[in-house]
């Protein structure tokens, strides 16, 4: 067990709650102590829903452990079924309750209810939240479709032609507390509709047990988030013959590839790629003169597997950035992330320690960080611009407005969210450069908010001091002229310049670093 201030994922029962809360006519009885009810806040505070999750907690206390906690479980299950009248009941236990070994799922199945009961056995001490969501979704589909899967013939993706209707697809994977899932679904449905393709079921988000039984009415499945839906898609393919897409439509190129993959599976004619590219502003901007400032910017990427891989591809192929770091906290996606990192000639970082990620960020010296809310805090400490691309996230990353990550509009949102921090970084550097000019006025407001630029001065001074405060490295001394020249370097690349200059001085055997050494090192490293 490891003590930490932050964690990227909660225990697996939180993943189960995400799936249950995303669906209708379903209820989750969770065998858990009082302290585990904190998860409700995730949905009301961060997701900002107007209703609490459909979860009943047994909320046993220390004094209950001396009695029969199994009776407590059965009483809560009975009350939940009578009060909420769900069409499907999920039963599981939290990490604490797992130690008691009451086996609430087995108890529920022996109580004689005439509704499907899904027994969730989620190993709390070896698995985490995304795995828990994936396993819950899979168990729901398996329970509700098991009999039907044995009766139907294998599904032909082109059967829509013989049936005389438009092709239909299922969109699988979006859940509450996922990164922009609600808006992604709207964007993907819009794109599919433009291609003459209907949506049969979206699940888990907004679906019911009745909808799950209709999954086989579709021709293919869209696996929108691999962390959540891939296991279910594989089961549907194996047992029902349903093909599924693997391309994640984040970014212009991947959206085009996604549309082509859907067309190929459904045997539809392929679309004109040039026409599709004009549906977003990102391709135009990346080719414009204004974007030259951004070419070659060093970017560090960390998040869940789906968004991290997509972000790295967009950064390299669509915006011309140099990806200097790529990683994920999701062990289930480690293989795919390692493969993506290998294509970029870098080593993938697979860890659930935010401190390891922060150390990797320091060593990579990026000019932009694309990560979770934890990387936003780390980047702020290091003075590096950051944009959040993945869960875990805070309330500011769940906008009330329409703000997808997928499709054409998603590319526009990404274009704004990634480019603006870099442009603002340039503005801060210009303020830093000219703040000593006699015409510079302290009272002018900063783009950072309603604070005067005096606060910004202090912040920039902190960045400068944190990057040049070390006077010696080994036997090398920074002279006054060297330190003065270093302060002229933009704060978001100053650490890299300082490190390279010290390496250069060590390799040349120089006892001190002055302004000339800085120029020589710059010429040496290019």
UniProtKB/Swiss-Prot annotation:
GO terms for molecular function: 4 iron, 4 sulfur cluster binding; ATP binding; metal ion binding; oxidoreductase activity, acting on iron-sulfur proteins as donors; oxidoreductase activity, acting on the CH-CH group of donors, iron-sulfur protein as acceptor. It is an enzyme of class 1 (oxidoreductase). Substrate binds at residues 425-426. InterPro entries: ChlB/BchB/BchZ, LI-POR_suB-like_C, Nase/OxRdtase_comp1, P-CP_red_C, Protochl_reductB, Protochlorophyllide_Rdtase. It catalyses: chlorophyllide a + oxidized 2[4Fe-4S]-[ferredoxin] + 2 ADP + 2 phosphate = protochlorophyllide a + reduced 2[4Fe-4S]-[ferredoxin] + 2 ATP + 2 H2O. Its EC number is 1.3.7.7. The active site is at residue 290. Keywords: 4Fe-4S, ATP-binding, Chlorophyll biosynthesis, Iron, Iron-sulfur, Metal-binding, Nucleotide-binding, Oxidoreductase, Photosynthesis. GO terms for biological process: light-independent chlorophyll biosynthetic process; photosynthesis, dark reaction. Binds 1 [4Fe-4S] cluster per heterodimer. The cluster is bound at the heterodimer interface by residues from both subunits. Its cofactor is [4Fe-4S] cluster. [4Fe-4S] cluster binds at residue 36. The keyword Iron-sulfur applies. Belongs to the ChlB/BchB/BchZ family. Protochlorophyllide reductase is composed of three subunits; ChlL, ChlN and ChlB. Forms a heterotetramer of two ChlB and two ChlN subunits. Component of the dark-operative protochlorophyllide reductase (DPOR) that uses Mg-ATP and reduced ferredoxin to reduce ring D of protochlorophyllide (Pchlide) to form chlorophyllide a (Chlide). This reaction is light-independent. The NB-protein (ChlN-ChlB) is the catalytic component of the complex. This is Light-independent protochlorophyllide reductase subunit B. It comes from Prochlorococcus marinus subsp. pastoris (strain CCMP1986 / NIES-2087 / MED4).
């Amino acid at each position: 067990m490891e003590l930490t201030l932050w964690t990227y994922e909660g225990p697996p029962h939180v993943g189960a709650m995400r799936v249950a809360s995303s669906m209708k006519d379903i209820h989750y009885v969770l065998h858990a102590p009082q302290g585990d009810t904190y998860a409700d806040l995730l949905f009301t505070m961060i997701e900002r829903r107007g209703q609490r999750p459909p979860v009943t907690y047994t909320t046993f206390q220390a004094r209950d452990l001396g009695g029969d906690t199994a009776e407590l479980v059965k009483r809560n299950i009975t009350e939940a079924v009578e009060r909420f009248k769900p069409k499907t009941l999920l039963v599981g236990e939290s990490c604490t309750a797992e130690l008691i070994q009451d086996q609430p799922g087995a108890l529920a199945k022996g109580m004689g209810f005439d509704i499907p009961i899904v027994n969730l056995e989620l190993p709390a001490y070896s698995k985490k939240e995304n795995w828990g969501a994936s396993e819950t979704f899979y168990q729901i589909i398996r329970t509700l479709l098991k009999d039907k899967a044995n009766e139907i013939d294998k599904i032909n993706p082109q059967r829509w032609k013989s049936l005389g209707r438009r092709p239909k697809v299922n969109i699988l994977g979006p859940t509450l507390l996922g990164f922009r899932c609600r808006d992604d679904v709207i964007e993907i449905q819009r794109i599919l509709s433009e291609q003459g393709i209907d949506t049969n079921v979206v699940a888990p988000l907004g679906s019911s047990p009745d909808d799950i039984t209709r999954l086989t009415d579709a021709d293919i499945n869209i696996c929108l988030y691999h962390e959540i839906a891939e296991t279910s898609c594989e089961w549907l393919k194996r047992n029902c013959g349903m093909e599924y897409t693997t391309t994640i439509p984040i970014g212009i190129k991947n959206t085009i590839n996604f549309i082509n993959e859907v067309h190929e599976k459904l045997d539809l004619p392929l679309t004109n790629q040039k026409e599709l590219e004009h549906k977003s502003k990102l391709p135009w901007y990346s080719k414009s003169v204004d974007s030259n400032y951004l070419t070659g910017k060093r970017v560090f990427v960390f998040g869940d597997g789906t968004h991290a891989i997509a972000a790295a591809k967009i950064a390299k192929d669509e915006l011309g950035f140099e990806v200097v770091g790529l990683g994920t906290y999701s062990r289930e996606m480690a293989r795919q992330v390692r493969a993506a990192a290998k294509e970029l000639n870098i080593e993938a970082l697979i860890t659930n320690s935010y401190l390891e990620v922060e150390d990797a960020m320091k060593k990579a010296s990026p000019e932009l960080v694309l990560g979770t809310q934890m990387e936003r805090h780390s980047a702020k400490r290091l003075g590096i611009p950051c944009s959040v691309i993945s869960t875990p996230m805070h309330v500011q990353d769940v906008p009330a407005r329409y703000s997808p990550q997928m499709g054409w509009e998603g590319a526009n949102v990404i274009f704004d969210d990634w480019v603006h921090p870099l442009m603002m970084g340039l503005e801060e550097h210009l303020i830093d450069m000219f703040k000593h000019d006699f015409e510079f006025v302290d009272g002018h407001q900063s783009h950072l908010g309603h604070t005067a630029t005096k606060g910004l001065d202090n912040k920039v001074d902190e960045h400068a001091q944190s990057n040049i405060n070390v006077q010696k490295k080994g036997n090398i001394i920074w002279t006054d002229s060297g330190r003065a020249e270093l302060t002229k370097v933009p704060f978001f690349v100053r650490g890299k310049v300082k490190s390279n200059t010290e390496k250069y001085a060590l390799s040349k055997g120089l006892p001190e670093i002055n302004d000339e050494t800085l120029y020589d090192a710059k010429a040496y490293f290019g």
